[in-house]
Structures are given as structure tokens and as C-alpha cells.
């Protein structure tokens, strides 16, 4: 993978730079939930903002001018990724927040005005979405006729919930249930996961959680898949909705734990995948184990590097390649249908 230019800022002692770095890294990382990747132009502008050379408003103006001069059709949705990224960074940089359905809807409007016609509007039609993690099945999303009432009910229930006396395990479980239920309503036609993530981060702050690390930025697709698994049942095949994956994510986010967050572990057919993997024989030895450990990071394919060396390869193709690397073992055999499920290509 390409080096993250924002990671160094998370180690900064200067609070302003550290927080700006977190806001930008999260904003850009969240685009991965829809398979989007911002432009290098935005990344460069973001770094200038973190360094204090330009303001967020100036970044926005630069970006608007950039796309006015580049009006051609953007098939990989880079313009959407760029504009939504700066809007997320701006919202995360603001302290104002109210725990209300209107705030939730307002965040969607702020993120997607000029991008989606339905920005800030509750959908009036029912939806299904094929999910890779469910092997092509869909979550049952909220009914169009009941969306507003369902949203208001979830907010009312959470607002009157008391965290007093709960252990941290109980708090994290409850937060996982709350955000999973909020996302399942899927009140908008598009942009639900990014809206939910931004709202949830803002809400966590009101509960006293800092959450200024790179967990959302580096595991945005995991977050979405964990939300899916928290809302899916197939009892006939022994599959039950579970918040266990979401809780692992939250423990890393809120408690700085180092739980393994791997998408393929959530796949409903993961056990079958294990059966197909070659067996490895382990032998006890007094040898220096440290020298024999596999350096997983070095084994990962640097997809971004190939994008620079092969002319004509698009950012969208690179994103699809990254998703495939994340979803399958290097020894796993997979066919066209699995590729379509992971990438959304048909």
C-alpha cells in the first residue's frame, strides 16, 4: 500500500497539527467504504492545511476551481471523494453538535449537496444492496414508509439510556448495538455509512471519548462490513447477527487495543475458506523463532507502486486490486463471481 502522508502528524506534540492530521486522515479514509479514493491534488492541499499554510475554506476554494477547470466526466468518482473528504474534515474540526435526528440528516446534506440530488432527504423507496461479506446477500434495511419514525425512536431510546454503573465492556457493546441499529435504517439513498461514521464520531466525543487515532481511516471497509454482520441473519445456515466484529473495531478505536481487524474473517463462508487452505505442519525447534517469522507487511503487494509504473491504470482499478488483496488469502483460489462481489463490478 502507499505510505500514508498523514500518519506522521498523529505523532505530533503540537495539538493543532495532530488534530488536523487526524481529521484529514479519517475524512479521506472513510471514502473507502464506497471504494473511492481522493486525488493527489486534495492530499497536497490537505497537507498545506495541516501545516497552517492555508485554511479549510481555502482548500475548498482551490478544489472548486480545480474541478471547474476539469469538467470532464469523472468515472472513478474522484471529485466526489475529494469534496466529501474536505466536508468531513470541516465537520470533524467543529465542536458544535446536537444529538438529534435533524443533526444526522444535516450531516448528510452538508456532505453530499451538489453530489447527490437527494442530499439531506429521506428516501421514499425501498432498497437492497448485494454485500461481499454476505456472499451477495443483502441486509434487510428500514422500510421507506417508517424511516422517520424509526430514526426518531432510536434517538429517543439512546437519549434516555444511562451508562452509569456500566463496565467498559458493557458500554462498548451498547455503542455497537446503537450504531448498528442507526445504520440499518439506511435512511438515505446513498452515503449512509459515511454519514453514520461522522455522526458517531461526534457523538462519541460528547461521551468523553477522544478517538483521535487512525482506526476509522485504515479500517473503513471493515467498519462497514461489521455493520452488515451486525444486521444479518440466515438461521437456516447457522448465521446470526452479531456485534462481535463491531466491538473489536470499537475496542481498537476507544481503548487503543490491537485486535486483528480483517475483512475475510467476517465473511459468512469463512469456515469453508479455511477448509480450502493448505495445511501447514509445525515442528518444535530451539531455533531462533524471531528470525523465522514471516514479515506480513513486507509480503503485502504494494498496489500503489504499480499504479505509478503502469501507464493508463486508473485509481478505481487500484482500489479494486487493494480490495481483492484485503479479501482473499494469497493462496486462495477465487473466480469471477467472487471478484464481482468484492468490487461491485458486473
What are these regions (language model features)?
Residues 1-346:
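FIC/Doc superfamily catalytic core
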Amino acid at each position: 500500500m502507499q505510505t500514508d502522508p498523514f500518519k506522521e502528524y498523529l505523532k505530533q506534540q503540537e495539538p493543532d497539527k495532530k488534530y488536523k492530521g487526524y481529521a484529514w486522515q479519517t475524512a479521506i479514509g472513510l471514502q473507502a467504504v464506497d471504494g473511492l479514493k481522493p486525488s493527489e491534488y486534495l492530499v497536497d492541499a490537505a497537507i498545506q492545511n495541516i501545516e497552517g499554510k492555508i485554511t479549510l475554506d481555502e482548500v475548498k476554494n482551490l478544489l472548486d476551481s480545480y474541478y471547474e477547470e476539469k469538467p470532464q466526466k469523472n468515472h472513478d468518482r474522484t471529485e466526489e471523494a475529494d469534496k466529501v473528504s474536505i466536508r468531513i474534515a470541516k465537520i470533524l474540526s467543529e465542536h458544535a453538535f446536537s444529538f438529534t435526528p435533524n443533526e444526522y440528516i444535516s450531516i448528510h446534506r452538508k456532505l453530499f449537496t451538489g453530489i447527490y440530488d437527494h442530499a439531506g432527504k429521506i428516501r421514499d423507496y425501498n432498497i437492497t444492496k448485494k454485500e461481499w461479506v454476505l456472499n451477495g446477500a443483502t441486509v434487510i434495511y428500514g422500510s421507506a414508509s417508517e424511516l422517520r419514525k424509526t430514526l426518531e425512536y432510536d434517538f429517543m431510546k439512546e437519549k434516555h439510556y444511562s451508562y452509569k454503573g456500566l463496565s467498559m465492556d458493557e458500554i462498548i457493546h451498547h455503542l455497537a448495538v446503537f450504531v448498528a441499529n442507526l445504520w440499518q435504517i439506511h435512511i438515505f439513498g446513498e452515503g449512509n455509512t459515511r454519514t453514520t461514521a461522522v455522526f458517531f464520531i461526534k457523538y462519541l466525543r460528547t461521551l468523553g471519548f477522544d478517538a483521535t487515532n487512525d482506526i476509522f481511516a485504515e479500517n473503513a471497509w471493515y467498519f462497514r462490513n461489521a455493520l452488515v454482520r451486525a444486521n444479518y441473519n440466515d438461521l437456516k445456515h447457522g448465521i446470526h447477527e452479531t456485534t462481535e466484529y463491531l466491538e473489536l473495531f470499537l475496542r481498537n478505536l476507544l481503548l487503543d487495543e490491537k485486535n486483528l481487524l480483517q475483512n475475510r474473517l467476517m465473511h459468512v463462508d469463512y469456515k469453508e475458506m479455511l477448509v480450502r487452505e493448505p495445511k501447514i505442519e509445525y515442528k518444535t525447534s530451539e531455533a531462533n523463532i524471531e528470525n523465522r517469522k514471516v514479515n506480513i507487511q513486507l509480503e503485502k503487494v504494494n498496489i500503489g507502486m504499480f499504479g505509478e509504473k503502469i501507464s493508463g491504470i486508473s485509481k478505481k482499478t487500484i482500489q479494486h486490486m487493494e480490495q481483492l488483496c484485503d479479501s482473499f488469502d494469497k493462496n486462495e483460489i477465487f473466480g469471477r463471481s467472487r471478484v464481482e462481489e468484492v468490487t461491485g463490478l458486473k
